[in-house]
Amino acid sequence: MPDAEVRKILNIPEDRIVIELSQVTDSVEGTPVAYDIKYILYEQAYPSVESEIRFAVFPELTLPKMAAFSYYTDVQIRAVGASEAVAKVLECRIGEPLLLVERIYIQQNGKRIGYALHYSRQPYGALKGTSGYRL
């Protein structure tokens, strides 16, 4: 079951099942440089979720089941100090500056369907973006 912070962000009750996916990205030298934590609501209507988890990239796991314009993303980008848990995964010191990209996936009706955290170490974090759909 998700912790209180994740339940609050996703606006779900305590007994709601959430799937947590974690991924660490290493540099060529083998140093951990990025850490992703993703939460998606478990839907029994999609029995293939269990078999897809090993192979899917986060939005590809749930979002193809929806029309492209049926959801949007709230994004917050900020600098944070590494918590004890994140420092352990990224093999850095507690408090080391990291770039955090936090995303909440929201359906047009306001229902929150996913939450993602991406931590990047220096000098690997960079910002670049495109807005809207490019045809």
Task: Kindly give the residue locations of the regions a language model identified.
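C-terminal all-alpha effector/ligand-binding and dimerization domain
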Residues: 1-135
